[in-house]
Regions:
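Segments forming oxygen-rich coordination pockets for charged ligands
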Residues: 1-204
Length: 204
C-alpha cells in the first residue's frame, strides 16, 4: 500500500529539501479535528489538514518558521517540538478546547528512514522528544526492548487485534496507524440508488 501522506512527504522533501509534519497528539474538549490528524508542510505547499481555521493557519506559519531556520544535514537529527494551543479568544478560535501539536522536521537525511509504501496494518511509533527516528512495526513482535513498556504493550495489542488501532500518546511516545482506519458504511437497499451510493463512496 502507498499511503497518500507518505507519498506527499517524500515528494515535498525531494522537491523542497525539507518538510514539517504537524500532528495533533492531544485534543481535549471541543477541537476541529481529533488525535492523529496531520498535515505535511513545505515552504511552498502543504497537504493534509488539522481542521482549518486559526489553529491550522497558526500551525502552518509555525512550521514554515521552522523550515526557514532549517539547515540540511548528512545525518538524521529528527528534530521535534510540542506546542500547546488553547482554542479560545487568544487564538481567535471559538472551539473552547485544547490541542497539543507535534512538529517534526524531516529532511533528506531523515527521509532515508521512511518507507515509501507500507503494509495494511503498519504502525508508526516515535518519542515526542528529538533524536530518535520513526519506528515502523508490522508484526506484534516488532517492538524493541528500548521502547517503554507501555509502548511495547500497546503496539503488540494493536497488531494482534486485541486493541483498536487509534492514534494515541503513550509514555511520551506517539503511536499511530500509517494507513487511515477504514470506516464501515452500511447501505440498506440494493437497488440502482444503493449501487450508485456504494460506487460514489468506494474511493473515500
Amino acid at each position: 500500500m502507498k499511503p497518500e501522506w507518505l507519498t506527499n512527504l517524500h515528494e515535498t522533501v525531494t522537491a523542497e529539501g525539507g518538510a514539517v509534519r504537524v500532528t495533533i497528539i492531544r485534543a481535549d474538549g471541543s477541537a476541529p479535528r481529533g488525535v492523529g490528524s496531520a498535515m505535511t508542510v513545505g515552504r511552498a505547499v502543504f497537504t493534509g489538514t488539522i481542521g482549518g481555521g486559526a489553529l491550522e493557519l497558526t500551525a502552518l506559519l509555525a512550521a514554515r518558521d521552522l523550515l526557514d531556520g532549517y539547515v540540511a544535514v548528512t545525518e538524521p537529527q529528527w528534530r521535534r517540538e510540542v506546542r500547546d494551543f488553547p482554542l479560545g479568544p487568544a487564538l481567535g478560535q471559538c472551539c473552547g478546547g485544547f490541542v497539543q501539536l507535534l512538529f517534526e522536521t524531516v529532511g533528506e537525511a531523515e527521509l532515508r528512514d521512511v518507507p515509501v509504501a507500507s503494509s495494511k496494518d503498519m504502525l508508526l511509533a516515535r518519542p515526542i522528544k528529538s533524536g530518535q527516528p520513526w519506528r515502523f512495526a508490522t508484526h506484534r513482535k516488532d517492538d524493541q526492548e528500548a521502547w517503554p513498556l507501555g509502548v511495547r504493550s500497546h503496539v503488540r495489542k494493536c497488531l494482534s487485534g486485541t486493541r483498536g488501532r487509534d492514534a494515541v500518546l503513550n509514555s511520551d511516545w506517539f503511536i499511530e496507524p500509517v494507513n487511515a482506519p477504514v470506516q464501515a458504511l452500511f447501505v440498506y437497499g440494493a437497488g440502482h440508488v444503493g449501487r450508485a451510493v456504494v460506487k460514489t463512496f468506494a474511493d473515500f
